[in-house]
């Protein structure tokens, strides 16, 4: 009887403790809710949700595999395999850090992966998640052991809007300074991506990846045009029966960079906005599968040349824009971007302009006569 009583007491304590943590992790506010770590399609995830939209953060690899309206299953970031389990993977929107593209031969032999380590490691969930009047906030971090760097990510979903902001602080933990790059790698996929899906951006001067040194930026073109290896001019707003040129990069000239994909048939618009001082390059790629659009990358970052560091150092800049950054020993730098959704009419013609006006994001339609303007509340998360 004594043993049974003690066991019952211990069980009661355990249940009370677990219940307290569950309540802390799922505390509901009138502004929205922060859900405890949960399994989404069999993977460890954080889910941030307000009354408009749902945002999923994958812990093993740090990807953002899902951002959609609550009343719809249509997820623009439906790209990459969300295999059940805890192995890191690259899905939807993932981070390339400390590089974009391949390592050098020597770095590869030492284990440095393509696009760096940030999507190849398990991220840590930091224990200061909170809900405020501004929105639902979460933090996660990753250590990059080969690079000797760390990333601390802060994510805030607006209180009642399909709009979220990500700020990432990159720290150089090495005893010496080093060069590095950071590129955001969002990729859209079907069914949102199809033939009538339109991509617009304010990227300007551009070139196709794969050109030979010392002038890989030749031939030059202007968005939304590009030139294939055969010298054919193509328009890149819509994806048709070709995936050439496969990867292209464009300099952002304005203070605010943006890239938006819209599908009137599906009634959905999805996009990003960022400061040029953080990310001066817009990098685009696309891929067909069975003759149909399969993937479109709306990438933006600190570089526009998809090469190892020795090549970047030799080239240094393209179109007057540097191809890498330097971070001194023990120092850090913070970069941010915002992502948004909007419902659109079936005859929406694409986007000509994105601006921030106070606490509103204004998206102007790409038509000459009477363009419509979409307004998205930012909650003051970006200015």
Label the model's feature ranges.
Residues 10, 25, 331-332:
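N-terminal leader/targeting segments
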Residues 12-13, 27, 33-35:
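Detector for intrinsically disordered, low-structure N-terminal pre-sequences
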Residues 18-30:
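Bacterial N-terminal signal peptides
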Residues 1, 7, 31, 35-36, ...:
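Intrinsically disordered, low-complexity regulatory regions of eukaryotic regulatory proteins
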Residues 1-17:
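N-terminal secretory signal peptides that target proteins for export/translocation
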Residues 35-165, 173-383:
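Surface-exposed acidic/polar loop and edge beta-strand patches at domain peripheries
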């Amino acid at each position: 009887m004594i043993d049974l009583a003690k066991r019952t007491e211990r069980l009661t304590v355990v249940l009370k403790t677990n219940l307290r943590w569950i309540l802390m992790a799922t505390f509901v506010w009138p502004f929205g809710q922060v859900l405890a770590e949960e399994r989404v399609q069999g993977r460890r995830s954080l889910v941030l949700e307000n009354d408009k939209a749902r945002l999923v953060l994958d812990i093993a690899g740090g990807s953002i595999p899902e951002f959609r309206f609550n009343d719809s299953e249509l997820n623009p970031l439906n790209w990459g395999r969300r295999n059940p389990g805890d192995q890191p993977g690259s899905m939807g929107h993932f981070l390339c850090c400390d590089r974009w593209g391949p390592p050098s031969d020597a770095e590869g032999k030492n284990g440095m992966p393509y696009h760096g380590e940030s999507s190849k490691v398990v991220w840590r969930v930091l224990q200061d998640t909170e809900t405020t009047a501004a929105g639902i906030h979460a933090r996660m971090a990753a250590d990059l052991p080969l690079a000797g760097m760390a990333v601390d990510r802060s994510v805030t979903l607006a209180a009642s809007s399909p709009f979220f902001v990500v700020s990432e602080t990159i720290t150089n933990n090495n005893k010496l300074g080093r060069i590095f790059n950071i590129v955001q790698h969002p990729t859209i996929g079907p069914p949102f991506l199809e033939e009538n899906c339109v991509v617009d951006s304010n990227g300007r001067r551009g070139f196709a990846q794969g050109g030979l040194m010392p002038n890989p930026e030749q031939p030059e073109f202007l968005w939304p045009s590009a030139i294939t290896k055969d010298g054919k001019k193509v328009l890149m707003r819509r994806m048709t029966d070709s995936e050439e040129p496969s990867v292209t990069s464009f300099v952002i000239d304005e203070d605010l960079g943006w890239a938006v994909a819209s599908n009137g048939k599906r009634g959905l618009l999805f996009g990003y906005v960022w400061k040029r001082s953080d990310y001066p390059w817009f990098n685009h790629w696309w891929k067909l599968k069975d003759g149909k659009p399969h993937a479109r990358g709306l990438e933006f970052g600190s570089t526009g040349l998809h090469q190892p560091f020795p090549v970047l150092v030799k080239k240094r800049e393209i179109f007057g824009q540097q191809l890498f950054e330097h971070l001194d020993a023990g120092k850090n730098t913070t970069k941010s971007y915002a992502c948004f959704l909007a419902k659109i009419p079936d005859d929406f013609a694409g986007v000509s302009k994105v601006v921030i006006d106070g606490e509103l994001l204004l998206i102007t339609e790409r038509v000459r006569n009477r363009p419509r303007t979409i307004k998205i509340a930012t909650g003051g998360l970006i200015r």
